[in-house]
Amino acid sequence: MLNAPADKVGTNSDIRHSNAALLSIAHELPPEIVTSDYFDEQLAGTYKRLRMPKGLLERLAGISTRRGWAEGQTFEDGVVAAAEKAIEQAGIDRSQIGLLINASVTRDNFEPAVSVGVHDRLDLPRHALNFDITNACLGFVNAMTVASTMIDAGAIEYALIVAGEDPSPWHRTAVRILNNPDST
C-alpha cells in the first residue's frame, strides 16, 4: 500500500499531465464482417423454441455488424500492424520507446502477457517495460494515465499503448450455450 499526504491527493478527474502528448493513432480493422443476421441464422432453432422473433439481437444490442479476423490471423497480428503504423506516424525510432502497454481483454493464454509477444514482434528495446492492463473499455484510458504519469516523472521518453480484440471465441461459446435444448 502506498500513501500520499492528504493535501496532495485529488480525484481521478484532477489528474493533469504536463509533459505527455498524443503523437499518433492508428488502427487495423479485421477483414471479416459478421452480421447480426448470421447470428439469427445460427440461433434460429432456439428463437423458434423460445418463440423469440428474428432480429432480436440487433434490436436489443443495436449492433448490425461486427468484425473478425480471417482464418490464420490473430488479434495480435492486428495489434502489431496498427502499432507499426502508429510508430511510423509518430516519426520516432522504436529504440526510444520505454513502455508498451497492451489494453486488450482478449488473450490466447493466461501467461505470458499479450504485451510480451507484441514487444518481441515489434522488436522493441529490451529495456522497454511491457505489461497488460485488462480493464475492459477503461483499460485504454488507464493505460494512457499510467504512460503519461511515467512520462511526466521522467521515467520514459515514449510509450506505446496497443489494444486489439477478438470476440469470436466468445460468440461461438454463446451460440453453443444458447442452442443447448435446456437453455431458456
Mark where each language-model region is.
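Short glycine-rich or small-residue beta-strand-to-loop segments that form or flank ligand, phosphate
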Residues: 99-105
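Anionic group-transfer/hydrolysis microenvironments
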Residues: 26, 104, 165
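Acyl-thioester C-C bond-transforming condensing/cleaving domain
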Residues: 2-17, 48, 84, 88-94, ...
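Conserved "HGTGT" condensation-loop signature of ketosynthase/thiolase-family condensing enzymes
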Residues: 1-98, 120-123
